[in-house]
């Protein structure tokens, strides 16, 4: 085969190890390179890179098994908070915590997922969620995500009807949409990505500021996925999107 189409998600597909193995074996593949995947999989590293690259992102800190019971006031964080594994995908193990009981329960649950050894906490930002697909370094139209159950979790991502998705958004002015798209492109470049990926943003209800939450190295490509919706709004049929990904990957790998 000329190239392998990467359609994996979570740690096995997005942490860069498979990409590095393919590089060593001389196997061509679609999607971002191993470095971009490795950097984006670690949520704390991603935050640090975003901050130095001028990409707005919520502050955050990590906890290990040894520090997981540290009091919140000692950490300088206050409820409500988001708790999530430092390295995982598909929103698995993400919890919104409004009470201390919720928080400590979420911490312990997060450490139980796939032998997680590090968990990230960050302030919970109430707001509207937007996905910014990036293809060949250029932002696609934004997709607004309105989860039916309040959180765009694993079930809502992969279940038909789990969320309403509006592309392009009608609730956000054109200027802010463009600012988010440019921030998505900066995030893509800062993480040394190539070919395609998807940056997830939230616009705060409190002050209207936007924040990049994370970068998805291999965004979903199912019928219910966000990247194909954004690409369609940009004029790509599904087959054309796949062809564009293959062509960009061939350029990057050869």
Regions picked out by a protein language model, each given a short descriptive name:
Residues 39-128:
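Active-site nucleotide/adenylate-binding loops and adjacent lid/helix of ATP-dependent enzymes
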Residues 1-59:
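Conserved N-proximal alpha/beta basic substrate-recognition cap immediately N-terminal to
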Residues 123, 188-221, 231:
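Conserved metal-phosphate-binding beta-hairpin within the catalytic cores
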Residues 63, 94-99, 134-136, 204, ...:
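Short beta-strand-to-turn element immediately C-terminal to the catalytic PLP-Schiff-base lysine
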Residues 144-197, 229-254:
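Active-site "cap" helix and flanking loop/linker of ATP-utilizing ligase/carboxylase catalytic domains
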Residues 10, 91, 148, 216-230:
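Glycine-rich phosphate/pyrophosphate-binding beta-alpha loops
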Residues 98-182, 209-211:
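Phosphate-binding site of ATP-dependent enzymes
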């Amino acid at each position: 085969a000329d190239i392998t189409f990467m359609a994996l998600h979570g740690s096995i597909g997005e942490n860069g190890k498979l990409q590095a193995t393919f590089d060593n074996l001389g196997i061509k593949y679609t999607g971002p390179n191993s470095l971009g995947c490795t950097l984006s999989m670690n949520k704390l590293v991603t935050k640090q890179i975003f901050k130095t690259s001028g990409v707005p992102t919520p502050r955050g800190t990590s906890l290990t098994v040894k520090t997981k019971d540290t009091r919140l006031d000692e950490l300088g964080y206050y409820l409500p908070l988001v708790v999530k594994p430092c390295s995982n995908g598909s929103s698995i193990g993400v919890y919104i915590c409004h009470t201390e009981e919720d928080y400590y329960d979420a911490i312990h649950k997060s450490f139980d997922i796939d032998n997680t050894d590090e968990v990230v906490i960050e302030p919970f930002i109430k707001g509207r969620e937007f996905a910014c697909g990036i293809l060949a370094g250029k932002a696609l139209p934004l997709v607004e995500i309105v989860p039916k159950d309040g959180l765009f979790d694993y079930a809502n991502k992969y279940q038909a009807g789990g969320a309403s998705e509006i592309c392009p958004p009608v609730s956000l002015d054109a200027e802010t949409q463009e600012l988010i798209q440019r921030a998505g492109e900066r995030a893509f470049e800062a993480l040394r990505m190539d070919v395609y990926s998807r940056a997830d943003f939230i616009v705060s209800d409190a002050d209207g500021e936007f924040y990049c939450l994370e970068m998805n190295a291999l965004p979903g490509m199912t019928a219910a996925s966000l990247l194909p919706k954004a690409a369609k709004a940009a004029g790509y049929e599904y087959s054309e999107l796949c062809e564009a990904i293959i062509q960009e990957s061939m350029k990057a790998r050869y």
